[in-house]
A protein has these predicted regions:
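N-terminal binding-site loop/beta-alpha segment at the start of enzyme catalytic domains
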Residues: 1-80, 143
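Surface-exposed, flexible loop/turn segments at secondary-structure boundaries
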Residues: 12, 24, 61, 88-90, ...
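Proline-rich low-complexity regions
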Residues: 14, 74, 87-88, 107
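Hydrophobic faces of well-ordered beta-strands that scaffold small-molecule active sites
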Residues: 14-18, 53-55, 80-84, 113-118, ...
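Active-site mouth loops of central-metabolism enzymes
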Residues: 22-36, 85-96, 124-127
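Structural motif corresponding to the early beta-alpha repeats
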Residues: 59, 75-94, 119
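Glycine/proline-rich, positively charged
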Residues: 91-162
Length: 162
């Protein structure tokens, strides 16, 4: 697997990552993850050099994070990058932002996220991000070592970014 050095760091990230939004399910009408098959996929990806694993709070109805944490537990923590995302639109107040973040760490069974994104930002979510001081909170988590790299995913017109 080809890897690229991340910016001016020693971190090397695989060109392909494993997204955990569409893991195999036990049936067509459920979000329940087929853990045995999904573990095979994680192990195959890892054994073939994939070291970037991407999840989010709501993937698989909330089951993706509790799956991927234990699925990666057998591997040295520094050998892979785990990314998750803050569902800004789900948070009603600043306390909920903190609760969701800490819940994600616990569900993933990690002390930090290598990459942490504000998820699915658009005009409305940007306003909520500001109102709830999400960026300030995440910067604090970064200073505390609970986030290594901070970013966002964006789903709106380019003009919104201006």
């Amino acid at each position: 697997m080809e890897k690229r050095r991340y910016k001016n760091t020693a971190l090397e990230v695989s060109l392909l990552g494993l997204g955990c939004m569409r893991l195999p399910k036990v049936g067509p009408d459920t979000e329940e993850i087929d853990k045995a098959r999904a573990q095979e996929i994680v192990d195959y990806a890892y054994s073939h050099g994939v070291n970037y694993f991407d999840t989010a709070y709501m993937y698989h109805g909330g089951a993706s994070e509790p799956f991927i944490g234990p699925a990666l537990k057998k591997y040295p923590r520094e050998s892979y990058c785990l990314a998750s995302k803050m569902p800004v639109w789900m948070c009603k107040d600043e306390a909920e932002v903190e609760r969701v973040f800490n819940e994600q760490l616990a569900k993933c069974q990690v002390d930090y996220f290598d990459f942490y994104l504000c998820h699915s930002l658009n005009k409305d979510h940007f306003e909520r991000l500001e109102k709830l001081h999400v960026y300030d909170f995440l910067q604090r988590m970064k200073k505390e070592g609970k986030i290594r790299r901070l970013g966002f995913s964006f789903h709106d017109k380019p003009e919104v970014l201006r």
